[in-house]
């Protein structure tokens, strides 16, 4: 198949959109939710994630994920930039150059790592985060991405993840939970957003960029991309309305933070399903994700006693699970030729079983490996800053900078 200029143009745009999601999207969304003494450090965690993962991706990440399968566990031993034939078509997307496919996939890895940082903001050592990034990327993201997208055993079992419900949201959410448990709670656990306006801008950039994230995962400009874009928007809208209603039921007043959280829950939940479900299913997915994520944040977290500071597990992890299982319920084969069977509502149970296997496998693997990795870092390096540094703020103590100079 020949390279297609229209598909190539769309994928160039989609790649840029997903980078925009990480910086400044995630960075601004997170920074607005923290105390003002930690705004720069919170932004820095996302920025440095993009930088480190961008280099690691072309050194070994791409080859070990997409360079050919070895026993269903990991990709080819061929690693490095030489593996990528920049001018030829990708075997995964035959109408775009392989180099473009490679950098598009790199953006997914970068945002996954950046998302994890939200669980441990305001207390993690910056130097420990720098060490965590390459270790977690190599030990968790790379194998999981190969299992699901690179011809690994989960893909061969029929697990479907259109744009990263498993690879991005479940891994980041579960890793965030494990890292938060090992790091321990902040001394002041109250969520005190210092500037919700930043979070509004960040959420807007996320919503905008998510069209590249999901519709771009069609890897071409056509009806599949159009469907993914539509259901992404409707799920985000349904999630936002769902969370507002939950706020209203519990407190009697809707909150802007709730609206932002619901929109992100809707976006995350439709990610694995965007290329497999119709508009009606996307609305149900977004609403269900909002309700369950609301309960995870407002009830499960305080009941269990963990300090996932910005609710990475409660929103991304839970939404990723809901959306992945939603594929097994609502998938419509007519929308995507890669589906060999539909969801449970079409009378088939096989896809739902495959999706459940994928969720359980990745959840357990991610939690165990991340927990062990965090424990090792805690033992040999230390994960969190000193009490006085945390109280005074990380911006001035770790970076000798301040986000605001008020005179």
From Swiss-Prot:
UniProt keyword Cell membrane, yes or no: yes
Alphabetic keyword roster: Ammonia transport, Cell membrane, Membrane, Transmembrane, Transmembrane helix, Transport
UniProt entry tagged with the keyword Disulfide bond: no
SUPFAM superfamilies: Ammonium transporter
GO CC annotation: plasma membrane
Chief site of localization: membrane
Membrane topology: Multi-pass membrane protein
InterPro entries linked to this entry: Ammonium/urea_transptr, Ammonium_transpt, Ammonium_transpt_CS, NH4_transpt_AmtB-like_dom, RhesusRHD
Entry's transmembrane regions: 9-29, 47-67, 70-90, 101-121, 129-149, 162-182, 196-216, 226-246, 257-277, 279-299, 312-332, 357-377
One Pfam family it belongs to: Ammonium_transp
GO molecular function: ammonium channel activity
Subcellular location as annotated: Cell membrane
Family according to the record: Belongs to the ammonia transporter channel (TC 1.A.11.2) family.
Classification via PANTHER family: AMMONIUM TRANSPORTER MEP2 (PTHR43029:SF10)
NCBIfam families found in the cross-reference section: amt
Protein name per Swiss-Prot or TrEMBL: Putative ammonium transporter MTH_661
